[in-house]
Curated annotation (Swiss-Prot):
It comes from Rickettsia bellii (strain RML369-C). It is found in: Cell inner membrane. This is Inner membrane-spanning protein YciB. Plays a role in cell envelope biogenesis, maintenance of cell envelope integrity and membrane homeostasis. The keyword Transmembrane applies. InterPro entries: YciB.
Length: 180
């Protein structure tokens, strides 16, 4: 439960900071503080932090600090694009190398045939590249308020739909000893 809260906490802080704290600068500051607190608490509670969380927090810190110092919101807006591209590359290359990263992320939840992990890896890479393109379109063509609303209310449903679309692959190819 705490892991889920640590993932959505910074997004909620960003949304609240934007709409109740005075705009993108406040939102960025709130998100930075919340992210550092969450990753620290994850480490204290679980004694570990996932690589993806470390990458995400590092990119956030760099883009967020540059946004705060420069006053230019472009840097915080390109953060999702940078992360999506990094994650897309990770999933794509791990699929190409036949050592799918997604397997290590999800194997404790579901066990699949090896070729299904590779297929899921390619699909996940495609999803992240798609999300990078969508983020670029939204932040470059719409006002800050629209981008923030998309970040909070658009990304989650799109991700949920992507996950639902993977269910047939997962259910068809799960191994008998899978927990799901």
């Amino acid at each position: 439960m705490f892991k889920l809260l640590s993932e959505i906490g910074p997004v909620v802080a960003f949304f609240a900071g934007f709409f109740y704290g005075g705009g993108i600068q406040s939102a960025t500051l709130y998100m930075l503080i919340t992210s550092v607190i969450c990753i620290t608490l994850c480490y204290i509670i679980d004694k570990k932090v996932s690589r993806l969380s470390i990458i995400s927090t590092a990119v956030l810190l760099v883009s967020g600090i540059i946004t705060l110092i420069s006053g230019d919101s472009m840097y915080i807006k390109i953060k999702p694009t940078i992360l999506y591209v990094i994650f897309g590359i990770i999933f794509l290359t791990s699929g190409i190398k036949k050592n799918p990263f997604i397997k290590y992320a999800l194997e404790s939840i579901i066990r699949l045939k090896e070729e299904s992990w590779i297929t899921l890896s390619y699909r996940t890479a495609t999803f992240f590249f798609f999300m990078a393109i969508v983020n670029e379109i939204v932040w470059r063509n719409f006002p800050d308020e629209t981008w923030v609303k998309f970040k909070v209310f658009g990304v989650v449903p799109i991700t949920f739909v992507f996950i639902l679309l993977q269910l047939p692959l997962l259910l068809k190819n799960k191994l008998p000893d899978s927990k799901i």
